[in-house]
Amino acid sequence: MANIKSAIKRVEITERNRLHNKSYKSAVKTLTKKYFDAVAAYSASPSNDALQAAQTSLSAAFSKIDKAVKRGVIHRNNGARKKARLARALNRHLANAAS
């Protein structure tokens, strides 16, 4: 354990930031799972309601990822990769539906 006052404070700040970052990462994962569930529902039975639900979930996930990047919780390349994977999932099903 740290003995110096500034080192003790840094340990406390690091722990606080770790918990804050953990909540952001958890929220990103939760919204991502909800989005993939919405895409699966749209794939199972394509309808305008299912598509609208998937697009709403996509918007929420994009927003949370962008906020996590802005706050430095995840790297911008990591955020871009996550967003690309999300967009690709829906676009793949939309292309299959159009064919």
Curated annotation (Swiss-Prot):
The terms under GO molecular function for this entry are:
small ribosomal subunit rRNA binding; structural constituent of ribosome
Q: Name one GO cellular component term.
A: cytosol
Q: Which residue positions does the secretion signal occupy? A: none
Q: Which Pfam families match?
A: Ribosomal_S20p
Q: Which domain of life is it from?
A: Bacteria
| A biological process term (GO) from this entry | translation
- What UniProt keywords are attached to this protein's entry? Ribonucleoprotein, Ribosomal protein, RNA-binding, rRNA-binding
Query: What does this gene product do?
Result: Binds directly to 16S ribosomal RNA.
Which family is annotated? Belongs to the bacterial ribosomal protein bS20 family.
Matching entries from HAMAP family are given as: Ribosomal_bS20 (MF_00500)
Q: What is this protein called?
A: Small ribosomal subunit protein bS20
Organism expressing this protein natively: Cyanothece sp. (strain PCC 7425 / ATCC 29141)
Q: What is the lineage of its organism?
A: Bacteria, Bacillati, Cyanobacteriota, Cyanophyceae, Gomontiellales
